[in-house]
């Protein structure tokens, strides 16, 4: 029996065909997804994955698309954006958030319950699932210090709960990247604190972020991982690359570790600029800059 296409098979779920991912990424770049689905709960996510597996449709999962570059050729198969799964609950000293919940909102819920430990994440624009996926961090804090469990959907469709050890956190890394699990929820173990003091620390970090980072322009956040013994922004600055324009993309004049979209940039502009920076820094300083930003999708069939 011939299977219906996935959009037809799930009329109750919002599924768009040939949808430009530039509408969703924080860089405002990226080609189309063959199918873009917005599941609202675990069962819908599980059903979409099972159906896609049945018809051999590749599956890609995206959270808030903040630290992400989608190539201009887009993504074949099914892309699921989990931002409709955003419930956050508290119990005692723990906060449990669905994968699509904004990390910023999660920190605000923790503060409202006078729970300390997530202050460092107050300005990180990603989702909870994305934060687990890459062990997000800022200002000396990392998700690995507070995330004690994550409920995941395996590529085979099994729901499992991973403990902190099984999440195998490292610098901008977790086991989710190795096994291609889909994060469904994450649980954070926090410490009782003073709500006003927690808010004051969050306000301070947000002010520091606003002063140093180009928040007013589209970007993918930190482009590169910090190389041992160096500061990425400083290396780029000293190489004379700050302010360099490449198509519609530019090395931020506010913080050289960021690439901003100043004039209808394409993902290709971003990626070519990234490769240029890597080549210059390798030749000048002998330092290999690894990308922190997640890069997915296919090259365009015709280059500009």
Curated annotation (Swiss-Prot):
What InterPro entries does the record point to?
A: FAD-bd_PCMH (IPR016166), FAD-bd_PCMH-like_sf (IPR036318), FAD-bd_PCMH_sub1 (IPR016167), FAD-bd_PCMH_sub2 (IPR016169), MurB (IPR003170), MurB_C (IPR011601), MurB_C_sf (IPR036635), Oxid_FAD_bind_N (IPR006094)
Cross-referenced SUPFAM superfamilies, in alphabetical order? FAD-binding/transporter-associated domain-like, Uridine diphospho-N-Acetylenolpyruvylglucosamine reductase, MurB, C-terminal domain
Q: What are the record's GO terms for cellular component?
A: cytosol
- Tree of life domain: Bacteria
Instruction: List the GO biological process terms.
Output: cell division; cell wall organization; peptidoglycan biosynthetic process; regulation of cell shape
Q: Give me the reactions it catalyses.
A: UDP-N-acetyl-alpha-D-muramate + NADP(+) = UDP-N-acetyl-3-O-(1-carboxyvinyl)-alpha-D-glucosamine + NADPH + H(+)
Q: Which UniProt keywords apply?
A: Cell cycle, Cell division, Cell shape, Cell wall biogenesis/degradation, Cytoplasm, FAD, Flavoprotein, NADP, Oxidoreductase, Peptidoglycan synthesis
* Pathway annotation from the record: Cell wall biogenesis; peptidoglycan biosynthesis
Q: Report the Gene3D superfamilies cross-referenced here.
A: 3.30.465.10, UDP-N-acetylenolpyruvoylglucosamine reductase, C-terminal domain (3.90.78.10), Uridine Diphospho-n-acetylenolpyruvylglucosamine Reductase, domain 2 (3.30.43.10)
**Cofactor(s), names only, from the UniProt record:** FAD
- GO MF annotations, alphabetized: FAD binding; UDP-N-acetylmuramate dehydrogenase activity
Q: Which residues form the FAD-binding PCMH-type domain?
A: 28-193
What Enzyme Commission number(s) apply to this enzyme? Answer: 1.3.1.98
Q: Where in the cell is it found?
A: Cytoplasm
Active-site residues from the entry: 172, 222 (proton donor), 292
Q: Which family does it belong to?
A: Belongs to the MurB family.
The record, for HAMAP family, names: MurB (MF_00037)
Q: What does this protein do?
A: Cell wall formation.
Q: Specify the protein name.
A: UDP-N-acetylenolpyruvoylglucosamine reductase
Species the sequence originates in:
Levilactobacillus brevis (strain ATCC 367 / BCRC 12310 / CIP 105137 / JCM 1170 / LMG 11437 / NCIMB 947 / NCTC 947) (Lactobacillus brevis)
Q: Which gene encodes it?
A: murB
């Amino acid at each position: 029996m011939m299977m219906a296409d996935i959009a037809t098979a799930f009329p109750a779920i919002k599924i768009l065909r040939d949808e430009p991912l530039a509408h969703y990424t924080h860089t405002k770049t990226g080609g189309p997804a063959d199918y873009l689905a917005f599941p609202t709960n675990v069962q819908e996510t599980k059903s979409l994955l099972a159906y896609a597996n049945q018809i051999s449709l590749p599956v890609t999962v995206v959270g808030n698309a903040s630290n992400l570059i989608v190539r201009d050729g887009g993504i074949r198969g099914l892309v699921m954006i989990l931002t409709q799964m955003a419930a956050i609950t508290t119990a005692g000293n723990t906060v449990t958030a669905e994968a699509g919940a904004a990390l910023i909102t999660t920190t605000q819920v923790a503060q409202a319950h006078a729970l300390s430990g997530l202050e460092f994440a107050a300005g990180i624009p990603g989702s909870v699932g994305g934060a687990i996926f890459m062990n997000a961090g800022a200002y000396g804090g990392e998700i690995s210090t507070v995330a004690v469990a994550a409920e995941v959907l395996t590529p085979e469709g099994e729901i499992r709960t991973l403990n902190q050890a099984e999440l195998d956190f490292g610098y901008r890394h977790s086991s989710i990247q190795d096994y291609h699990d889909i994060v469904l929820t994450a649980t954070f173990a926090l410490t009782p604190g003073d709500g006003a003091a927690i808010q004051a620390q969050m306000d301070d970090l947000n002010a520091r972020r606003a002063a140093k980072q180009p928040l007013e322009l589209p970007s993918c956040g930190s482009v590169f991982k910090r190389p041992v013994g160096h500061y990425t922004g400083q290396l780029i600055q000293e190489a004379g690359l700050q302010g360099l324009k490449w198509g519609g993309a530019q090395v931020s004049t506010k913080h050289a570790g960021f690439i901003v979209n100043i004039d209808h940039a394409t993902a290709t502009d971003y990626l070519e600029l990234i490769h240029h920076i890597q080549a210059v820094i390798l030749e000048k300083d002998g330092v290999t800059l690894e990308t922190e930003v997640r890069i997915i999708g296919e090259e365009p069939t015709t280059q500009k």
